[in-house]
Amino acid sequence: MKVTVIEEPLLEFGKGTHICPRNGIERMGVYDTKDELRRSELRLGIVGRGEGVDKLDVWLDLCRSGIVGKESELSNLFKGFGGVSADYGFFTRLLSSPGFTRALQKSSIVKVSRIKTREERVVAAVNLYYEQVQFLAENRAIDVIICVIPEELFLSLTQKDAGSKKDTGSVEQYMEHDF
């Protein structure tokens, strides 16, 4: 058997190249900082229930402020994260506002969660969020829209239908969510 080792390519960043994405962003900024039309703000639209939106706001604050790295002999493994700010790394500000947020009613979530078949629940949930996403896209100057899915709705969308013999898997198989 013949084995060929391919050298890992250098990644391009705003002010140079580096092999590591984290180090490259930290030291040289993201690639599009070279773009003269690049915006310095990222406006976030949010669709979800109150509690989930509040948790997302806390998480976004953590993203803005940064995360301290862990002590380790492997210095590159548990590096800190400097945060998302206009002065560092991503060179942008994350902007969220109540005016960019669309709240879903609990009664609407419960109604979708009680639909008998999973397929119909998924379609109803997509339609529920789509109305609010469409409003934000058409009426606000938004760059990214984040859909916050309440746990009750998430569980109803990831569980098998009542009476179905096919199991869709456990919640643990899905990405961790806490919004």
Regions found by a protein language model. Give the residues of each.
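Long, low-complexity, intrinsically disordered terminal regions
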Residues: M1-F179
